[in-house]
């Protein structure tokens, strides 16, 4: 029996955030690719060159507001950071709090997306 694209998509849609993150890392390693978004060129040439030279490669993920769905946000914080329940709860309730420091742009943007979908407010610094 052949596996269809729909079967693969159904399987992926049932993965937890942590399992999906691990799957993406395995794809990156196996196929030598990156899940980072493609940069689109634009703007003035002189301004673009200066921006490229100063573009950050490492970011701090700062939770500025836990939002209304704190339980969901706490679960995501635990999955992203590996913190225990009490530590994750404290991080969500005592904002602003730095969740991770010095992470790659793609990882920081993915974490921000997950947290914002759960109702939290996040800054990348």
From Swiss-Prot:
GO molecular function, one term: structural constituent of ribosome
GO annotation (BP), single: translation
Pfam family, one: Ribosomal_L12
Membrane spanning residue stretches: none
Gene Ontology CC terms, in alphabetical order: cytosolic large ribosomal subunit
Ribonucleoprotein keyword on record: yes
Record's keyword terms, sorted: Ribonucleoprotein, Ribosomal protein
HAMAP family: Ribosomal_bL12
Quaternary structure annotation from Swiss-Prot or TrEMBL: Homodimer. Part of the ribosomal stalk of the 50S ribosomal subunit. Forms a multimeric L10(L12)X complex, where L10 forms an elongated spine to which 2 to 4 L12 dimers bind in a sequential fashion. Binds GTP-bound translation factors.
Record's function text: Forms part of the ribosomal stalk which helps the ribosome interact with GTP-bound translation factors. Is thus essential for accurate translation.
Similarity field: Belongs to the bacterial ribosomal protein bL12 family.
Protein known as: Large ribosomal subunit protein bL12
Native organism: Campylobacter jejuni subsp. jejuni serotype O:23/36 (strain 81-176)
Organism phylogeny: Bacteria, Pseudomonadati, Campylobacterota, Epsilonproteobacteria, Campylobacterales
The gene coding this protein: rplL
């Amino acid at each position: 029996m052949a596996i269809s694209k729909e079967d693969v998509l159904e399987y992926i849609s049932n993965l937890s955030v942590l399992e999906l993150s691990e799957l993406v890392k395995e794809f990156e390693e196996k196929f030598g690719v990156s899940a980072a978004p493609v940069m689109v060129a634009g703007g003035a040439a002189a301004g673009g060159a200066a921006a490229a030279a100063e573009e950050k490669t490492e970011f701090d993920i700062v939770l500025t507001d836990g939002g209304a769905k704190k339980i969901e946000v706490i679960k995501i914080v635990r999955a992203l950071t590996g913190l225990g329940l009490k530590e994750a709860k404290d991080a969500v309730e005592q904002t602003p709090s730095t969740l991770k420091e010095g992470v790659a742009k793609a990882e920081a943007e993915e974490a921000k997306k997950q947290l914002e979908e759960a109702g939290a407010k996040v800054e990348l610094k």
